[in-house]
Amino acid sequence: SQGDALAEVQSLAEYLTAPVVNSYLHNDTFPAGHDLACGPIGYCGSKAAMRTIRQADVVIALGTRLGPFGTLPQYDMTYWPDKARLIQCDTNIEVLDLAQRADVYSCGDVKAFTAQLVERLRKRAPDRPADEARLAEVRHAKETWRAELDAWSASSQSAPMHPRRFHREWTRALPARAIVTTDIGNNASMINAYLKFEGIRQHISALSWGNCGFAYGAALGCKLGAPDAPVIAFQGDGAYGISGVAEVMTAVRENIPVVAIVACNNEWGAEKKNQIDFYDERYVGAHLPDNPDYARLAEDMGALGFRVDHPDQVGDALREAVASGRPCVINAIVQGGKEVLAEPFRRDALNRPVRYLDKYAHLNAR
């Protein structure tokens, strides 16, 4: 199956000395510690991956439809290599040649396709040496991005926490075998730059469906399906309020020891960032001023609750929650607002509104 093709994909990458980027919200499809791994492209992903793929002459897209959230400009960088030749393989014929024009495509199993491709390449050049110059380029790209991200994430010791500092702390404390489910929203997207996995099927996300409130219910299912793996659900306070908070009682009643991490910034971050950038900070429905203490609420339901508002508390709280073997909620108090929110999902999607009736003139963006 496509999910079991890691050995073949790794063999192909190593034979070609080809850098590997993860598609959007699939941070678990290639080992992050591999010399050729560059991280995820797409919204709030890895600049190393984006800077690398934009130099490509050929892109081999395996088991991905190359959706728009994974190929549109990010960090003010247009990185998708429009002039590169594209080879695409997927079992679903409907995604082939859909979002990006493929020069060659194959409707087939990625594992079988990749194995046969490597076999044919080895017959043509059995002793192909590794490209040391390319390995050095990949290493430099990753080191540069790591330094940028560290500077971005380590600048604040404040309480409440800068969200990027918070994301760095909790992702560093993740157990190696952890399964992480992520929701949609500004904070949930920001962690795409931080989540790293060495195994497959460790990152479960809402993908392009955008179904807010996804992560906690998905985590319950993951824990039932993989009871020996630590399972962490990450949500913002808006998404958690949709479904997560109510389902803590389910986790307690059914003894499903999932850890929920709630980034509480008292706002719908994605919507607020659009209103900051496109509506001159005229806010409608963007604020959540009356959130309860989700840690205390979890304890009232019979779960363990942790409230953290300083970076030094985060790692210990997550480690204690995982070790407890009980349903847990970590209520993380983070900063919100225009100084810390990530860029909008789509800078090209909104234009300033035009009002044609005088009675609505007072609503015009300034």
PLM regions with names:
Residues 42, 46-68, 189-268:
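Thiamine diphosphate
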Residues 22-38, 132:
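Short connector loops at secondary-structure junctions
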Residues 17-24, 87-90, 258-263:
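Short internal beta-strands
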Residues 38-40, 44-45, 98-104, 201-205, ...:
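Short beta-alpha connecting loops at secondary-structure transitions
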Residues 83-184, 311, 320, 326-366:
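Phosphate/pyrophosphate-binding active-site segments
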Residues 42-96, 288-292:
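Phosphate/diphosphate-binding loops
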Residues 55-56, 95, 103-104, 113, ...:
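Conserved thiamine diphosphate
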